[in-house]
């Protein structure tokens, strides 16, 4: 199934062009093409093994495509330093990845310090304020002194502290309880709009994809089955697989479509 075309007038922040990747004999990505305009939130959803995390990790070179091109901004990632590329893109994982023996403020200031920002610690304090964890109250704590939701807020603060234009999120809220997850989703939507961030989110939860993504991409067996706004996917599923996913998630989708 081919992709729905994006707005050609919008500058592209991220682009995958006919990307393939194998893990041994397993085809993880099979000719995937995807354009994400600046400022858009795109959510990739699919079952385990669909290729969604592999595709996301191509954009910060944690995975190198076998063939095809990955473009960040207007440059092929292969001509960019992996270290500098990763420092220029925010990245949030499911379990946060915080350094356990560093206090919260130092964790958040890590990338600004590495990038040589003169106001690194001020930037970290501002990022903590944006996620609702003021540095005066939380900056001196260690990660183990925080709740799961608070740790993910710190991880989100760290991802935006160096003021990136792009953030990649790999199942960022998947390990949280339902209340913490809902609160953090709401905070993230407001934060993304305030900072005009381009975001690429991977999730197994179709309702979460609909809440957080302007566009939703459904992947299966290394290919894109369908792309579009959640309402369009629900109204006109392109394949039986997409229709089955929607039916399983219908109860969670109803509030989004009311």
Language model features with spans:
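A short, proline-enriched helix->beta-strand linker immediately N-terminal to the Walker B motif
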Residues: 161-165
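Conserved ABC ATPase signature
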Residues: 142-146, 150
């Amino acid at each position: 199934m081919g992709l729905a075309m994006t707005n050609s007038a919008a500058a592209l922040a991220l682009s995958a062009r006919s990307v393939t990747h194998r893990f041994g004999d397993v085809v993880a990505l099979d000719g995937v093409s995807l354009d994400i305009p600046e400022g858009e939130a795109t959510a990739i959803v699919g079952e385990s093994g669909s290729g969604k995390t592999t595709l996301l990790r191509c954009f910060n070179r944690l995975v190198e495509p076998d063939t095809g091109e990955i473009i960040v901004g207007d440059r092929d990632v292969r001509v960019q330093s992996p270290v500098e590329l990763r420092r220029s893109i925010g990245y949030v994982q499911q379990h946060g990845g915080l350094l356990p023996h560093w206090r919260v403020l130092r964790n958040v200031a890590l990338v600004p310090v590495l990038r040589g920002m003169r106001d690194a610690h001020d930037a970290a304090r501002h990022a903590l304020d944006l996620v609702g964890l003021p540095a005066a109250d939380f900056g001196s704590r260690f990660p183990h002194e925080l709740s799961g939701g608070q740790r993910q807020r710190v991880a989100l603060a760290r991802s935006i502290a160096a003021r990136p234009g792009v953030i990649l999120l790999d199942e960022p809220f998947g390990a949280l309880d339902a209340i913490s997850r809902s609160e953090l989703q709401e905070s993230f939507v407001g934060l993304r709009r305030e900072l005009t961030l381009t975001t690429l989110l991977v999730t197994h939860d179709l309702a979460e994809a609909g809440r957080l993504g302007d566009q939703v991409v459904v992947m299966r067996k290394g290919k894109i089955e369908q792309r579009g706004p959640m309402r369009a996917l629900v109204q006109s599923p392109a394949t039986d697989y997409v229709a089955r996913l929607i039916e399983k998630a219908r109860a969670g989708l109803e509030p989004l479509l009311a």
